[in-house]
A protein has these predicted regions:
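N-terminal capping segment at the start of a domain
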Residues: 1-23, 36, 43-45, 55-57, ...
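Solvent-exposed loop/turn segments at secondary-structure junctions
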Residues: 46-48, 123-127, 151-152, 175, ...
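Soluble metallo-hydrolase cores and metallopeptidase-like ectodomains found primarily
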Residues: 61, 75-90, 132-213, 225-228, ...
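Extracytoplasmic/secreted proteins, especially bacterial periplasmic and envelope-associated proteins
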Residues: 3, 7, 24-35, 150-154, ...
Length: 377
């Protein structure tokens, strides 16, 4: 199999949902699935997106003057031309995603004390491009910008010392209605229980401005390697559906649409397990989020029997951060494979040269073992 991660991240490049490059990636994945002998189905869907019209920028005006690293928030409101200037005040924590993305929040204040805009610091480090989760989008169309953790630390030091912190910030974007994306499915029919299904999935879009090598071309490559392993080995008893989801970076629109339509058709109860591969191209260990406990025990038995052992960290707290979550909400056993840590997450530096091909191979082998175990023979 060719270097799929290289093709998606380098030859095609950034693949924001609804773009022509995302559509090119969908066609490439569909063709690869056909070459593997899978029966391919494509599910188009429309969604509400957002595109930047001015980049996120923050300039420190007091107690010193300098530029501050800034990232865009998808679905942010727009600042007026010329930006917004005001005093910075710490206003608490923004709970973008419970137990995971809980970030320090600052307001840019007008002279009368009203909030003009918000600066939210990435507790994990750099000023990345990120999305305002449902909670963040409920409170009007205020301008939001992502800061880095170092700026948060600086603000805390200055405010604790009683110093005034002033900034000028700018960001602008437009909501785009009717953007088109696709879920691409490759089907490997079951030999004796074809009405029961195992879903193996990975999203193929990337965040704005990022080549998305690790997030998530690596997951797509791992998924297709599993498909290759399954197609060339003993046929599974249950049907295995390999799904490349679109628009994951826009709040998992692709997987949410797929789950909703399967539920409408009365087909959701066919799905017995879901294995999701997201960012498996780097890291010193494999982080596996899995629920319920019975599914975790099956994973552990598979990993214990593998000839090539590698560090695995288990977590049972399933969060709305990737495409396994809509299935989990419907009570379906799920597992997400993630390589961690990865310092180039959601940045323009998430490129092919950062990828460890051996990590992809090992993740694919581990997941293949799990899929074979739950799909039966």
């Amino acid at each position: 199999m060719e270097d799929i991660t290289r093709h998606l991240s380098q030859n095609i490049g950034p693949r924001p949902a609804g773009s022509s490059s995302e559509h090119s990636a969908a066609q490439y994945i569909a063709q690869t699935m056909i070459e593997l002998g899978l029966t391919v189905e494509t599910q188009p869907f429309y969604f509400l997106g957002w595109e930047p019209t001015r980049p996120a920028r923050v300039e420190l005006l007091a107690p010193e003057t300098r530029k501050i690293p800034a990232g865009s928030f998808l679905f942010s409101g727009s600042a007026p031309e010329g930006g917004i200037e005001g005093q910075v005040a710490h206003v608490g924590t923004m709970y973008l995603c419970r137990d995971f993305f809980e970030w320090p929040k600052y307001a840019v204040k007008a002279a009368d004390g009203s909030d003009l805009a918000y600066l939210v610091a990435n507790a994990g480090g750099p000023a990345i491009t990120f999305v305002l989760y449902e909670l963040g989008r409920l409170f009007g169309r205020m301008p939001y910008v992502v800061l880095d953790l170092a700026t948060h630390d600086y603000f805390q030091q200055q405010l604790a010392a009683g110093n005034e912190v002033r900034v000028r910030m700018d960001t602008a974007g437009v909501v785009k209605d009717g953007l088109l994306s696709h879920n691409v499915t490759g089907v490997l029919p079951g030999s004796c229980l074809p009405e029961e299904e195992i879903v193996v999935c990975a999203h193929y879009d990337s965040t704005l401005g990022s080549p998305g090598a690790c997030d998530n071309a690596s997951g797509v490559e791992a998924m297709l390697r599993i498909a290759e392993n399954m197609a060339h080995g003993p046929k599974p008893a249950k049907t295995v559906r390999f799904i490349a989801f679109g628009a994951e970076e826009y709040l998992m629109f692709g997987s949410k649409f797929y789950v909703a339509t399967q539920k409408e058709k009365g087909l959701l109860d066919r799905i017995k397990n879901v294995v999701n591969l997201d960012m498996v191209g780097f890291g010193d260990h494999l982080a596996v989020t899995v629920a319920p406990e019975s599914f975790k025990r099956r994973l552990q038995s598979v990993f214990a029997g593998m000839a090539e052992a590698f560090p695995v960290e288990y977590n049972s707290n399933v969060l709305p951060v990737s495409d396994h979550y809509p299935f989990y909400e419907e009570g379906i056993p799920v597992a997400m494979f993630l390589g961690w840590p990865y310092d180039d997450y959601h940045q323009g530096t998430d490129s092919r040269d950062k990828i460890d091909p051996d990590m992809i191979r090992r993740a694919a082998e581990a997941a293949t073992g799990v899929v074979r175990q739950v799909a039966g023979r």
